[in-house]
Amino acid sequence: MFKKLFRQDENILNSELAEDLPIPRHVAIIMDGNGRWAKKRFLPRIAGHKEGMDVVKRVTRYANAIGIDVLTLYAFSTENWKRPTDEVDFLMKLPVEFFDSFVPELIEENVRVNVMGYRENLPNHTMRAVEKAIADTAHCTGLTLNFALNYGGRSEIITAAKEAMKELELEGKSADDLTEEKLNDHLMSSGLGDPDLLIRTSGELRLSNFMLWQLAYSEFYFTDTHWPDFSKEDFLQAIIEYQNRSRRFGGL
């Protein structure tokens, strides 16, 4: 059944994309607008998060279908702990339900789960769900579904710099020997590559402390669509927009 779901998406999506233009290798998404989506429908905010979880599953299928290597989703920031307790509690339970229902499909489709963020601050039930999903899909070699969970870009850079400096000290070197490559090796996203395309939903035009180092030369795509309404057509439009841009990385 899972194979059928993925193959249907593959046929529809690939028919819409230009074959002679590049597909982004790494797509990152700031999934914004769950609360606004719920408010518009006179529903509690958690209803938006619940609907958003289903969209994560669909977008994962789309990304896998067109051959994206890494899909990074901003699930929970280090600042999100400031939200109401009942909302935070619900968000910390979502990974349990999400992975329990979706990991069998991910395994069948050779999708590997990765999580970057400060795991030590997560509740035990969330941590167990995360670690089990990572372990259960560790053998998979296809798409990497990477969640930024309890993640903050500034903290990540500081942590990476400290770790890089400690390594340099052990090597008998100084701060003058610190390079971009050395720092990059200690980022939470090390080994995944920088995002080629950042998508942000719900009309907000900011990064919100997300992958500040890695997004230096990424292409940005903003849409007014709230995350729970983000459709196959919205995803396709973002990819097509990327295909029609010229990436210069600071050159001409």
UniProtKB/Swiss-Prot annotation:
Native organism: Listeria monocytogenes serotype 4b (strain F2365)
Alphabetical list of SUPFAM superfamilies matching this protein: Undecaprenyl diphosphate synthase (SSF64005)
Role played: Catalyzes the condensation of isopentenyl diphosphate (IPP) with allylic pyrophosphates generating different type of terpenoids.
UniProt keyword Signal, yes or no: no
Cellular-component GO terms for this entry: cytosol
UniProt keyword terms in alphabetical order: Magnesium, Metal-binding, Transferase
Entry protein name: Isoprenyl transferase
PROSITE patterns on file: UPP_SYNTHASE (PS01066)
Family: Belongs to the UPP synthase family.
Stored PANTHER family: DEHYDRODOLICHYL DIPHOSPHATE SYNTHASE 2 (PTHR10291:SF0), DEHYDRODOLICHYL DIPHOSPHATE SYNTHASE FAMILY MEMBER (PTHR10291)
Subunit record text: Homodimer.
Gene Ontology MF terms: ditrans,polycis-undecaprenyl-diphosphate synthase [(2E,6E)-farnesyl-diphosphate specific] activity; magnesium ion binding; manganese ion binding
EC number: 2.5.1.-
Positions with a binding annotation for Mg(2+): 32, 219
Gene: uppS
Record's cofactor remark: Binds 2 magnesium ions per subunit.
GO biological process, one term: polyprenol biosynthetic process
Entry binding sites for substrate: 33-37, 45, 49, 77-79, 81, 83, 200, 206-208
